[in-house]
Amino acid sequence: MARITAEDCNKIIPDRFRLVVLATRYAKLLNYKVETNHIKKEKLDKPPVIALRRIAAGKVSVAQLEQDLINSLRTRTMIEPLVNQDESEAVEEKFEYLPEVYIGEDYSDLDDQIFIDEHGEDYETDK
């Protein structure tokens, strides 16, 4: 069995990082059986080897593979921009009903709490 090396693929994709990313994507597609037209001798090889061989032979469209990778990494849902600025201000105003106790930053409510230290003994914070 002939060994495929990165130097064989560098003629098609000169950047090694890009080669690894695209070969990985193509190997995953082969593994998920997206492409089922395997040649008989390729059935014995693992998907990464098949992917590297096909990239080195020029049988894979690099541009199509890049576009497929980009599409797979995109988010599926689009976030709609806030149309009206007044709506965001109205949301902020809805929280004005909270008393100051919940908004404070002094953490005084922890002073009378009982905590357990690393030895399993209880102690109070106001001692």
Swiss-Prot record:
The record's function comment reads:
Promotes RNA polymerase assembly. Latches the N- and C-terminal regions of the beta' subunit thereby facilitating its interaction with the beta and alpha subunits.
InterPro entries assigned:
DNA-dir_RNA_pol_omega (IPR003716), Pol_omega/Rpo6/RPB6 (IPR006110), RPB6/omega-like_sf (IPR036161)
Gene Ontology MF terms: DNA binding; DNA-directed RNA polymerase activity
Q: Whose protein is this, by species?
A: Rickettsia rickettsii (strain Sheila Smith)
Report quaternary structure and partners: The RNAP catalytic core consists of 2 alpha, 1 beta, 1 beta' and 1 omega subunit. When a sigma factor is associated with the core the holoenzyme is formed, which can initiate transcription.
What is the name of the gene encoding this protein?
rpoZ
Enzyme class of the recorded protein, top EC level = transferase
Tell me its family: Belongs to the RNA polymerase subunit omega family.
Q: In terms of domain of life, where is this protein from?
A: Bacteria
Q: Which biological processes are named by the entry's GO terms?
A: DNA-templated transcription
What are the record keywords, sorted?
Answer: DNA-directed RNA polymerase, Nucleotidyltransferase, Transcription, Transferase
Name of the protein in question: DNA-directed RNA polymerase subunit omega
PANTHER family per UniProt: DNA-DIRECTED RNA POLYMERASE SUBUNIT OMEGA (PTHR34476:SF1)
What HAMAP family does the record point to?
Answer: RNApol_bact_RpoZ
Please write the reaction equations for the catalytic activity of this protein.
Answer: RNA(n) + a ribonucleoside 5'-triphosphate = RNA(n+1) + diphosphate
Q: Name one GO cellular component term.
A: DNA-directed RNA polymerase complex
Task: Give the E.C. number(s).
Answer: 2.7.7.6
